[in-house]
């Protein structure tokens, strides 16, 4: 049989059997699958609009009741109630953290796609002036309240069309993203077991509503943390020759480390090396016995070359001054990279199918990080950004700001795109 161009009709005998040509091959998905697939796209958009008030209400509830990383007990309890209220009862609460998963089983056998939302808040005192602002000293300043609401909205949509799904949808509600620990906790309790693909979305304060960015390639950088301890020998400030000044050594190391960025790194590969904390001594006229620096490395490189470069500079610089220094280097999260061609196509196609080409945003790669990438080490994944900024409404503050908020009109769109991605992935990979 000669190859059939994408989008063309299958031969008559295959068409009668319910075959569709998708992703370069014929898929049998049952009688009238093509018509049913088209109807599902319309249903998802319409259902999202129907549930818009629900999604906004849930966002406001979780915004008003934030909980810090590792303390999300009440948040999890309420999410469970919300899921059970829509008829989703196959729920697993993790034992060693406040994470939770729920399974939505489709009407036909197939693969399992996971949709993920993070649920923790930040230790920020809110100054948004919203009538539903938090009052407990912490705040959903990174948009996790919106993520919960969008995933609950997607769950409600998919629950309504579950009979048409060729596979299952696993809902992942992850704690402790803000401290880059929750994804690892969930992996240790096998939250990704049985999952074939993963999708996540982040509401973003520098992307205009109602755009949705599903760009391929680099999306968010890794997060590495380092500590440098420089040994010294204490002496009076009037007699530095009798001691060994670790602050001077630390300053030299700090300056030299920028060679990793400007002289050892391909300039086409983004790299940030920031020393954000330096401490040494407690008295204005006494040379201390130690200096300590802490900082972060952000890059899209997956290897350990930056650590090795830093270690060589730290060690050799200290030796040049006749002392020693130690580098402690922690790999907290890998980069978020949309590198699976199939998932990239499905993710973009979901936005276009629902809202047209004009709805596709373009956000450049970000040097901030997301521990979604830890879950993404297990299976192919795709990560999207939902625009939350609306200058006309005065919604202009970025994520982490004490006055941060989002254009709530975009939340139902975020829910629809998540649901559409899940439905399309399951349709394309149907058994």
Predicted regions and their residues:
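Aromatic (phenylalanine/tyrosine) cluster motif
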Residues: 13, 21-22, 26-28
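Acidic/His- and Gly-rich active-site-bordering loop/insert found
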Residues: 38-140, 145, 149-165
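Divalent metal-coordination and catalytic microenvironments
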Residues: 62, 102, 115, 144, ...
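Metal-dependent amide/peptide-bond hydrolase catalytic core
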Residues: 251-431
